[in-house]
């Protein structure tokens, strides 16, 4: 087979996926190394723009942990994580919103626009997109009893109004969403970006939810597991084989598929064009989470 024929075959491999996902919505959580390394930033932006021009509707929800950590450190503020959630006081909340909505969001918008897309940056506070309430984390104490931990100004989404996203999509724009929301009382709350992505995927009845990470996917005993069912995940969390920042990722995937999102994926954002590999190739990449 000559080189040109090989290229054509690679393009044709994508055909059934293009037919399947044409006009559909895919929510992508963008974070980790893919937001730091220049090559990965460029390849991610290219993936998003290409998907839009192919007739697929990508919605990007982003994190920004490294940028937040850097500014918190320079301001001599303390930071703590519990099961992947940042404990957030008022000073930290100011930093979080400034970095996520004021800086990182606009950087992503600029990058995607540079690649030929029409991105629009917003946060969960804009257009009443996401309403949240304070999140009290339930954990098991040493005596086996359940207890709740106050994480400060950390929220959990109670409702999502997708109208602003749907309006942007109809006009050909790509929504880029910062994970900051507001309570009914007007209090600004920090939302875990994975959790925000899952809630938005549910509200949009997305076909796919994709979370970019700095691991090959879900690792159990150091080995990549390419397919997991709900019952497996609960067991792995209980035994500690899934822990730390991976817990909110798998929990948001489970919530999404429970609410009608067809497929949820945790993939390696360190691989250039990982989003296209997952959506448009037979092999895919990372871990698939499904019902069962």
Swiss-Prot record:
Record localization: Cytoplasm
Domain of life: Bacteria
GO cellular component: cytoplasm
Marked site: Transition state stabilizer: 29, 249
Matches recorded under InterPro entries: AceGlu_kinase-like_sf, AcgluKinase_fam, ArgB, Asp/Glu/Uridylate_kinase, NAGK-C
UniProt-listed Pfam families: AA_kinase
Gene Ontology molecular function: any one: acetylglutamate kinase activity
GO biological process, one term: L-arginine biosynthetic process
Primary site of residence: cytoplasm
Positions that bind substrate: 64-65, 86, 190
Annotated catalysed reactions: N-acetyl-L-glutamate + ATP = N-acetyl-L-glutamyl 5-phosphate + ADP
EC number(s) stated in the UniProt entry for this protein: 2.7.2.8
Keyword Kinase annotated: yes
Keyword ATP-binding attached: yes
Keywords: Amino-acid biosynthesis, Arginine biosynthesis, ATP-binding, Cytoplasm, Kinase, Nucleotide-binding, Transferase
Record pathway: Amino-acid biosynthesis; L-arginine biosynthesis; N(2)-acetyl-L-ornithine from L-glutamate: step 2/4
Role played: Catalyzes the ATP-dependent phosphorylation of N-acetyl-L-glutamate.
UniProt family annotation: Belongs to the acetylglutamate kinase family. ArgB subfamily.
Designated name of the protein: Acetylglutamate kinase
Organism name: Leptospira biflexa serovar Patoc (strain Patoc 1 / Ames)
Gene coding for it: argB
């Amino acid at each position: 087979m000559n080189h040109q024929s090989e290229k054509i075959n690679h393009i044709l491999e994508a055909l059934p996926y293009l037919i399947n996902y044409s006009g559909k919505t895919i929510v992508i959580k963008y974070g980790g190394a893919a937001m730091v390394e220049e090559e990965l930033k460029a390849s991610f932006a290219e993936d998003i723009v290409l998907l839009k021009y192919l007739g697929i509707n990508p919605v990007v929800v982003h994190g920004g942990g490294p940028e937040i950590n850097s500014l918190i450190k320079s301001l001599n503020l303390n930071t703590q994580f519990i099961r992947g959630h940042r404990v957030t006081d008022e000073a930290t909340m100011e930093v979080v919103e400034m970095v996520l909505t004021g800086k990182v969001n606009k950087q992503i918008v600029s990058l995607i626009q540079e690649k030929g897309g029409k991105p629009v940056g917003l946060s969960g506070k804009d257009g009443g997109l996401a309403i949240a309430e304070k999140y009290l984390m339930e954990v098991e104490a040493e005596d086996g009893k359940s207890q709740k931990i106050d994480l400060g100004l950390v929220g959990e989404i109670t409702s999502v109004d997708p109208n602003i996203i749907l309006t942007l999509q109809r006009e050909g724009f790509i929504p880029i969403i910062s994970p900051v929301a507001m309570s009914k009382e007007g209090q600004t709350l920090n939302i875990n970006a994975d959790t925000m992505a899952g809630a938005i995927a549910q509200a949009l009845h997305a076909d796919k939810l994709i979370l970019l990470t700095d691991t090959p996917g879900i690792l159990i005993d150091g080995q990549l597991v390419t397919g997991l069912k709900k019952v497996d995940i609960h067991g792995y969390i209980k035994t500690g084989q899934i822990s730390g920042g991976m817990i909110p990722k798998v929990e948001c995937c489970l919530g999404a598929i429970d609410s009608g999102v067809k497929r949820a994926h945790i993939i390696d954002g360190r691989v250039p064009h990982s989003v296209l590999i997952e959506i448009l190739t037979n092999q895919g990449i990372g871990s698939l989470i499904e019902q069962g």
